[in-house]
């Protein structure tokens, strides 16, 4: 264990000088003697000086303070002791419930599983949300991204998925809150507690008020905990909210480290940093990690480098649209933009595939007719097109659904719709079996039977 002294402090970046024969390795954790603050080595500058990023506030720090090298990367507790606990980036508890009791600690920097260790899966994961199960089904052991701009419902969708999957799924879950609001973290904790699934969830938070070092590493902390459960042979759920903040923390750190920015001011190592995280979120022959990640889309621009880099790593993309949210249709999932690799007749079966494609074709045709309707009005359409518009509007409304986690806002009880009921409902609408019902009957209901019942009340 060598010791050095602080020579320069620029915000979250701290330069430390060590004896030349005892320079720490990149990613080694250093400990500041006075405050107990942890620093992570990012660069070796030469002449015994290393540039580090602080895992906490550098307020009140001064030059000359002694820093000890721990000789190892940051390690965090892993195992059953993490379940039901709220921890920070270093694995320290923040829930006032005593120390986290685990037998092992793992380094947060680990190699991704090798090619021959990985295992693919085509098994579907039912979410109980109609639009997702029908048009962008999730694979067990797959990676899913929830893309959306500010205020279109990423976190609410994420919480509904956690509620539906974590309650139905008997395994363990890990939630990494990366650079999000403390209020949302608090809401999520109480939601889990009220649902009695807190004892199966490990929570790791690095909120948006934390220094960039915390926000950059907190996703790796959560992932390390999930990897331990996977390597034990379990099926783990990994939730990350929000991947964009991980990228943003990387941008802040990159600028502080003096790297030249690339497109739109992002770090030049954007693709590599994203790859380091995403390549580790994978299923092996021992167990699986199914990950659901919220991705903020700056200014609703899906071609921005951050969301564009994330797209390449995902099996399914759920795109939330502001135009659909403006219509009052929640979840505001864009049925034409959202995609999944699972949407293949060999994986999901012909009935599901044909229904999904028929729904998308109807909605696409309606989208094309909207210009004609806006200029000439509905009366100028042919009878066939009028029928398509009527069915498309019913489909659009039937894609909405009341959420369990939104009960407190809407007063409407949440609905979980099985895949079988979802396919049956959309098949019937596309086939014209419900052409006689008003479109309002399909808004904010669960199954098609509820829509028929609602139509009876509307008459």
From Swiss-Prot:
It comes from Thioalkalivibrio sulfidiphilus (strain HL-EbGR7). It is found in: Cell inner membrane. F-type ATPases have 2 components, CF(1) - the catalytic core - and CF(0) - the membrane proton channel. CF(1) has five subunits: alpha(3), beta(3), gamma(1), delta(1), epsilon(1). CF(0) has three main subunits: a(1), b(2) and c(9-12). The alpha and beta chains form an alternating ring which encloses part of the gamma chain. CF(1) is attached to CF(0) by a central stalk formed by the gamma and epsilon chains, while a peripheral stalk is formed by the delta and b chains. Transmembrane segments: none annotated. ATP binds at residues 148-155. The gene is atpD. CDD domains: ATP-synt_F1_beta_C, ATP-synt_F1_beta_N, F1-ATPase_beta_CD. PROSITE patterns: ATPASE_ALPHA_BETA (PS00152). The lineage of its organism: Bacteria, Pseudomonadati, Pseudomonadota, Gammaproteobacteria, Chromatiales. Belongs to the ATPase alpha/beta chains family. This is ATP synthase subunit beta. Its main location: membrane. It catalyses: ATP + H2O + 4 H(+)(in) = ADP + phosphate + 5 H(+)(out). InterPro entries: AAA+_ATPase, ATP-synt_VA_C, ATP_synth_F1_bsu, ATPase_a/bsu_AS, ATPase_alpha/beta_chains, ATPase_F1/V1/A1_a/bsu_N, ATPase_F1/V1/A1_a/bsu_N_sf, ATPase_F1/V1/A1_a/bsu_nucl-bd. Keywords: ATP synthesis, ATP-binding, Cell inner membrane, Cell membrane, CF(1), Hydrogen ion transport, Ion transport, Membrane, Nucleotide-binding, Translocase, Transport. Produces ATP from ADP in the presence of a proton gradient across the membrane. The catalytic sites are hosted primarily by the beta subunits.
